[in-house]
A protein has these predicted regions:
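Membrane-interface helix-loop-helix junctions at transmembrane boundaries of multi-pass membrane enzymes
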Residues: 170-199, 232-240, 295-314, 357-363, ...
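Hydrophobic, aromatic-rich transmembrane alpha-helices
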Residues: 159-170, 220-230, 286-307, 353
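Membrane-helix boundary/interfacial segments in multi-pass membrane proteins
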Residues: 2-7, 52, 136-148, 251-287, ...
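Extracytoplasmic
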Residues: 355, 359-519
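Hydrophobic/aromatic-rich transmembrane helices and adjacent perimembrane loops
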Residues: 65-68, 150, 219-222, 329-354
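Active-site lumenal/periplasmic loops and adjacent helix-entry segments of GT-C-fold
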Residues: 1-156, 176
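Membrane-interface alpha helices of multi-pass inner-membrane proteins
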Residues: 141-146, 185-192, 199-215, 226
Length: 519
């Protein structure tokens, strides 16, 4: 559908590189010939399922849906553990699926003023939002639909957090109160001594092995665990977990990545219009309503353990507003999404408790609170349904003649120069493109500007010598020319390419021609 196909492009290309190719050691299909700077194990699994005979859509949907469903079960279980209520668990999941935010209220007000609210609500197929890139679906359930590997990462993170809730629970059961209780979390032998080092070792291995399933989920989990460690005894167990996680992550990085996996930098303010603490507070209120700022009020009504966990869950969000690990700051939205998902547990508990407070008044207030926490997400979900119905589809022939020829004739070390394709018959062949859609590779940390300039040189040069020299330097083995194509808005010349290299493939309609550059 229209709301998800953009993110499906790099996922499906990577999956096909395993099912129809031999992409190991792994390269990034939209920037072939280099190491992989992207967590790809989800695509590796689904690609291998297709290779073993499962339809690609079934493999893709089965793994991601089961992972997300199991994560929801973990959220439900956490809410029930904290609040002893099934309704708290159900509400927690609903608050993740239907996000909070101010967008719907502002949208409704503007169109009430214009007198076209009902027509707009019925006909609109675009996400609403008034903050940068909110109309991408940056904060709603669409994130889980297009980033299918996120559910698995969240599930593994939730399992590790569930294990270490025992540490927090035991420490919060101590009878000391206030500053004395907090002091004893640092100034006693028990605060540091091992409790269950074997369990910590296992959890570290599990989390570390997930680094190439979803790196953001692993980092967010470590940040939350840092908060757990602050409020827990047995801090050396947390140290074991952190060290083992980093070691296992580094081992995988050395296997798959030639250089650095991340490019860390200080970046204050994320996407907030005003890069200040008040500006960040306003931004958080706009994108999430009361979920983040309101938790500061909730802390006064929570028990000691619940407070410790809620504060810890804020750490990934704090990280998102002060640091960046990739060239694309938008990627930090995942840390906020992860914090939001776990904070939903406490809002589920709050609404559930309020419903049982002081008869009818409590019930009315809880319904108002629940509606305010979901109305924006409910409308977003309606947009998702409309934008992915039968009239809003992007279709690709998975077994076209072009796809089959590329899969059969191009090998792992071949590199094909193409237009800047996102998702089409070429990407579905699993081949390594010199430069696919630039945003995917750029946001993963590749130098797309360099390759774009070289590609322009190849497609536009009038000199056969320049063409051959550039192709040889870039180790390009095939050049694809599409009838009437432009590259970076520049007119392309086929005549020089055709005079220099032999034609090795032409599509049935003559629109696509491929030239081989290998001697």
């Amino acid at each position: 559908g229209f709301s998800v196909y953009g993110d499906y492009a790099p996922h499906t290309a990577m999956m096909r590189s395993f099912s129809r190719g031999n992409n190991f050691p792994t390269q990034y299909p939209h920037y072939g010939g280099q190491d992989v700077k992207y967590h790809f194990m989800f695509q590796f699994l689904t690609g291998n399922l297709e290779y073993l005979g499962m339809r690609i859509d079934i493999a893709y949907n089965a793994v991601s849906s089961l992972s997300l469903w199991c994560f929801f079960i973990m959220l439900y279980s956490m809410a029930k553990r904290f609040f002893g209520s099934m309704s708290a668990g159900v509400l927690s999941v609903l608050f993740v699926v239907f996000r909070s935010g101010t967008a719907f209220f502002r949208f409704a007000y503007e169109h009430l003023q214009a007198g076209d609210l009902w027509e707009t609500l019925a006909g609109n197929t675009a996400f609403i939002g008034y903050t940068p890139n909110e109309n991408w679906g940056l904060w709603n359930f669409n994130v889980y639909l297009n980033q299918r590997h996120l559910g698995f990462g969240l599930l593994m993170a939730a399992l590790v957090l569930w294990i270490f809730l025992d540490w927090v629970e035991e420490s919060c059961a101590e009878k000391d109160k206030g500053i004395l209780w907090l002091k004893n979390r640092f100034l006693t032998k028990k605060a540091w001594m091992f409790k269950k080092p074997n369990t910590a070792l296992f959890a570290g291995m599990l989390l570390g092995l997930c680094s190439f399933w979803n790196g953001a989920a692993v980092i967010a989990c470590l940040l939350i665990l840092m908060g757990f460690a602050f409020f827990s005894d047995g801090k050396l167990d947390y140290l074991i977990l952190a060290i083992v996680t980093v070691v296992f992550s580094e081992i995988q990085s050395k296997m798959f990545v030639w250089g650095s996996v991340v490019s860390p930098s200080v970046y204050f303010g994320f996407l907030a219009e005003k890069k200040s603490l008040p500006g960040i507070a306003v931004y958080l209120f706009e994108i999430s309503g009361i979920v983040f700022l309101g938790v500061l009020v909730l802390l006064f009504f929570l028990k000691k353990m619940e407070r410790a966990v809620a504060v810890s869950i804020l750490f990934p969000t704090i990280f998102a507003f002060v640091a960046s690990l990739t060239p694309d700051i938008n990627v930090n939205h995942k840390y906020i999404i992860i914090s939001y998902a776990f904070l939903a547990v406490f809002w589920g508990g709050a609404v559930s408790r309020l419903f049982h407070w002081k008869g009818a008044v409590g019930k009315i207030l809880s319904l108002i609170l629940a509606l305010s926490l979901t109305i924006t997400g409910i409308y977003d979900f309606a947009v998702i349904l409309k934008d992915n119905d039968s009239g809003h589809r992007v279709s690709v022939n998975l077994n076209s003649g072009l796809t089959s020829w590329l899969a059969e004739n191009l090998k792992k070390d071949d590199l094909i120069l193409t237009p800047e394709y996102s998702i089409n018959e070429v990407t579905m062949s699993g081949v390594m493109m010199y430069l696919g859609w630039p945003y995917y590779a750029w946001s993963a940390g590749y130098d797309t500007y360099y390759r774009a300039a070289r590609a322009v040189e190849i497609y536009t040069t009038a000199s056969a010598q320049v063409l051959k020299k550039t192709v040889e330097e870039e180790q390009i083995t095939y050049i694809l020319f599409e009838e009437g194509m432009k590259f970076e808005e520049k007119e392309c010349r086929e005549d020089v390419i055709a005079d220099t290299y032999p034609l090795v493939y032409q599509s049935d309609d003559g629109r696509i021609r491929i030239y081989g550059t290998k001697e």
